[in-house]
Structures are given as structure tokens and as C-alpha cells.
Amino acid sequence: MNKKARRELDREIQSRFCANLIGAMPEPAVIVGDDGRLAAANEPAHTLLPALKIGEPLVLALRAPDVLDALRRVMASGRPETVLWSERVPVERLFDVCVAPLAAETGEIGAALLTLRDLTEARRVERMRVDFIANASHELRTPLASMLGFVDTLQGPARDDAKAREKFLGIMREQGRRMARLVDDLLSLSRIEQNQHVRPEAPIDLALIARHVADTLAPLAQEMGVDLNVDASRPVVVAGDRDELVRVAENLIENAIKYGAAADGSGADRVEVTVTRTAREGSLSVRDYGRGIAPEHLPRLTERFYRIDAGQSRSKGGTGLGLAIVKHIMARHRGRLTVSSQPGNGSTFAVTAPLHSAHIG
């Protein structure tokens, strides 16, 4: 075999080796020759960039000036670079693109390896974290500022005013309770998220929980003038965590009592709690006949700190985390939360979870 044939064989072996190497990589990866043409690409790269074709210029498939400029610099300098690439079609995605030189036996840069790491989910989670911290800080700062203002007043102008002191201390107590509820909900949400991957398996009777929570909230319903009805006579045993499912029932029933006033102001307020089952699932639904929820609010109800009427929610002791907690609890139970509502026609919140294995059928 002459030298020319040997070099061709070596290049073929190297090409196959590189193709096999990137083929084993889980992230999109391509190899581009010094002429800018595609030499190899793995399956994830073809999925991300369907226009990729071996032997054609990379620019035809990848319309990313920053990445292509980095590729040219790497080919010229032999030093690796990392750039960000944002793709907006068909959906917005963000990639960290690493461009590394591939040297030939002579030491010359004959190609470059591009790997694309998807940062979309990490960036989304980071935005959620920042928003969450900002919202939590705001929710705590408001009552704290109020309490500090009353402390200044009590230490100053109202120092010797017994009537004002009693009034301000009552307000401070309520603001303190509000902060305590918020901290409790934040801690609960954190614990649920930490255990999200662990599915609870204890046999829990949803009917028993519904009756227990309804009995607990009966004084509140009476105070609010709400007729609370429970249809949960037969056991419906799901696989779950009792404390968490009690929390779910408390949130849904208490919300219905507090915010489900009759739309026409007639005073004919009622809340219906129903527990049912299918062959494989158990459900607890809470129906009110209040003002209902406008369609634009429905997709955002389970967002943390989202409120339809922030003033009303805070005045009734809401933290803005109740439905977020319900959603995460049901996700841990491999179940779901569904909401149906029409303005002026009330709302129904229902949670569904798989039956315990001993009660299926």
C-alpha cells in the first residue's frame, strides 16, 4: 500500500472513530471540517437540526452567527470556545455550544467538534427560583413593615394611649399570624418537593378524610353562612400519605367556604364535597356555587403566590401557596388536580389518585 492510500485509509479510520465517538454521546454533537462542511453528526443533532446533511456546509442547517463565528476562530487559533445559542422556533430554547479543535497527525487543525448542551430547563428553573424568592420576600416584607410601623407608633405617639395600644397590638398579632402561615406553607412546599420522587404507599380512605376535614371546618362554614354537604359514605382507599391528603382536603374545602359566596348575593351559599371511585382511581371533588373563575385565570391558579383578587385573599388569611401545595402533593401521589369553572356558575376543584393496590377492582 502506497503512502497516499495509507493516508486515505487513516483518514477513513479517523472519520469512523469520530462518528462512533459522537454517536455514543447523549447530547447533540457534530464534526465540521476545515472547509465548514459537515463531516459527522449524531442522532440527537439530527433531531435538533433536521436540515443537517453530511458533506454540506453547516451554515445551511445552523443559522447561528455567534456559533459560526466561534467555529471560524477555533479553526484559526486552535483554542476551544464556548458560546450561547438561543433558538426561538418552534419553541424558545437555549444551548451552551462548546467548539473544540480536532488536530490531524501533522498538528494542523483539520476539523472541529461542536457539542450542544440544552440549558432551557435549567434557565427556566433559575427564573422560577428568582421569582419565588422575590415574591416570598415581598409577601413577608409587607406585614413586617406594618408591624415595625406599629411598634414605632406604640413607642412614640401612642405610648400612653391604652385604646390605641390595644388596637395596634391586635393588628400586629394578625400580621404575625399571617407571616407564620406563610412560613409554614413555604416549609411545607419545600418538604413536598424534596420527597417528590418518593411515592407514598399507605392505604388512606379519602371518604374518611373528607368527613374529618368537613367536621373540622364546620364552625368556619357556620360562621360564613355556608351550607357544607358531604357525600362520602363509602370507603375509597388510595395509596397515599394521610397528612398530605388531609392538607389537600383542607385547602380545597376551606377555599370553597371562604371564596365561594353565591354570585347573586342571595346568601344561598353551599359547598358540596363528594368522594367517588373508578376501577383504578379515587377522587375527592369540592363544588361551590360562587362567582366562578374567569378562563384567563385558570391556567395560573397553581402558580406560587398567584391570586385572582390579592386583597380579598390576604384579608381572608390566604398565602397564595395553597393550590401550589395541592398540585405538588398530588404530583407526589402520581395523581392530578383539575379545575372547572364558569363565571357566575361556581367552581369545582377535584383531586384524583390511584387506588391502593389492595382495593383495585
Where are these regions (language model features)?
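Conserved catalytic submotifs in the C-terminal HATPase_c
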Residues: 202-203, 222, 227-236
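PAS-family sensory/regulatory modules and their coupling/dimerization elements
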Residues: 57-121
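Sensory modules in modular signal-transduction proteins
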Residues: 7-45
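Short helix N-cap motif at coil->helix boundaries in the Bergerat
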Residues: 206, 292-300
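Conserved micro-motifs of the catalytic ATP-binding
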Residues: 194-199, 237-240
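Short alpha-helical segment of the dimerization/phosphotransfer core of two-component systems
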Residues: 174-179
